A protein has these predicted regions:
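Intrinsically disordered, low-complexity Pro/Gly/Ser/Thr-rich segments with frequent PxxP/GP/PP motifs
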Residues: 148-185, 328-353
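Short acidic, flexible loop segments centered on an aromatic residue
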Residues: 126-147, 303-313
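Short, solvent-exposed loop/turn segments enriched in Ser/Thr/Gly
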Residues: 108-116, 188-192, 285-291, 354
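A eukaryote-biased signal for short, well-structured alpha-helical docking elements
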Residues: 51-92, 229-266
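Asparagine-centered strand-capping/turn motif at beta-strand->loop junctions
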Residues: 105-111, 118-127, 196-198, 295-297, ...
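Terminal connector regions
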Residues: 183-219, 368-376
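Bacterial N-terminal signal peptides
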Residues: 33-42
Length: 378
């Protein structure tokens, strides 16, 4: 893969081959698709405990009945334009309390750009106190699915968390991602999920600018950029979606299935604060799903993740509440991704009697929806 990238870069620099803009874009898309295919077959974890399984399209299941509650932080979602060609404000809103920021942007121009998230106290004479309670970020690979997966690994891994806090005086600003922004080379992605708390209203701005731009001045003067053809930005209430199965799972004769991040389930609805227009989070990116269930009986139950929308690469957490255990799970662990074939699925665990929670979130650059399946073991 690295050889292919080096050859491609060499062609651009030497000029021995004339490449039209449309051909170049098509090549990039083909290269990305090739990298996804390769990634779904590359080993990345030794001694994996998961087991690949195959779920045919005509697989017969029973719909799991679950109670649903949405609560938790307000979500700021910035993913359109996904590939950024012009400097400007990509998303902006004023928020307070518990907030989750999900951003996903690619530098689409030749040369480096700076991606930044600015926090500004615009209204409060008293200082605004803020805290970063959890975060995960990744980027800089041509394989965007790997970036999405690594970002989630960091977000869900308790040991990688480094809580931060600070304050903003009246009119004061601070850059959130690194203190100076993130320098993005051409065609590179940066994706992040950040949980925050503000004790007073704060203006949050996601922006792209020149590498040497003064961030505070740019944040004041820059124009808000329009979305691309995919309407994926906005502000959404209650970004934690909780499901609790109504009945214990007891070696079911017919497998139980719960489908998530699907149009039938419905997506989070909110407002694009830059325009005031209604917004819908197609895919529920940035939403944290928690599925609570009880396993009963003497026989273990097979717990399966089945991505049915295409290649999928993420992380999640399996909690055994009976034993007080929390396990970080690569989804999948043997390869970067799975789901390049519709029958591909993974058995995450064989679960004995007890109370469990499975926590996950739709990863950036992955395909949806997914199914959770509980079936009896052989």
């Amino acid at each position: 893969v690295n050889i292919i990238i080096q050859i491609f870069s060499g062609v651009q620099k030497t000029g021995y081959i004339s490449v039209r803009g449309s051909d170049l874009m098509n090549f990039k898309k083909a290269l990305q698709a090739f990298l996804v295919t390769i990634s779904c077959g590359m080993l990345n974890v030794a001694g994996a405990q998961q087991r690949p399984v195959f779920i045919p399209e005509d697989y017969v299941t029973e719909q799991a009945q679950a109670d649903f509650v949405a609560n938790g932080p307000k979500l700021l979602f910035s993913d359109s334009p996904e590939t950024v060609y012009r400097n400007g404000i990509l998303y902006r809103d004023k928020v307070e309390g518990d907030v989750r920021l999900f951003l996903h942007h690619v530098n689409g121009v030749t040369g480096k750009k700076k991606l930044a998230v600015m926090l500004k106290n615009t209204d409060n004479l008293r200082p605004v106190h803020y805290k970063v309670t959890r975060s995960g970020a990744a980027g800089f690979a041509y394989d965007y699915m790997r970036d999405g997966k690594n970002s989630q690994k960091e977000y869900f891994d308790d040991s990688s968390q480094k809580p931060q806090e600070g304050k903003l005086g009246f009119g004061g600003s601070r850059e959130l991602l690194s203190g100076r922004g993130i320098i993005l080379p051409t065609d590179k992605l940066y994706t992040a999920t950040v949980d925050l708390h503000f004790d007073k209203p704060v203006e949050v701005s996601v922006l792209m600018c020149e590498t040497k731009s003064d961030l505070e001045l740019f944040n004041e003067a820059a124009a808000i950029q329009p979305m691309d053809e995919h309407p994926l930005r906005g502000t959404f209430e209650a970004a934690d979606w909780n499901y609790t199965l109504k009945k214990p799972v007891n070696a079911p004769e017919k497998p139980l299935m719960l489908e998530l991040a699907t149009s039938q389930e419905g997506y989070a609805k909110g407002v694009d604060a830059t325009t005031g227009l209604p917004a819908e989070n197609y895919g529920n990116y940035g939403v944290i799903y928690k599925v609570n269930f009880t396993v009963a009986g003497k026989k273990p139950v097979s717990f399966i993740l089945n991505p049915i929308g295409g290649p999928f690469a993420g992380y999640g957490v399996l909690e055994n509440k009976t034993k007080g255990e929390r396990q970080l799970l690569a989804l999948p662990e043997r390869t970067v991704c799975l789901g390049s074939k519709i029958e591909e699925a993974i058995e995450l665990a064989q679960l004995k009697a007890g109370e469990y929670s499975f926590i996950w979130s739709p990863p950036g650059a992955s395909n949806l929806p997914v199914q959770l399946i509980w079936e009896k073991t052989e």
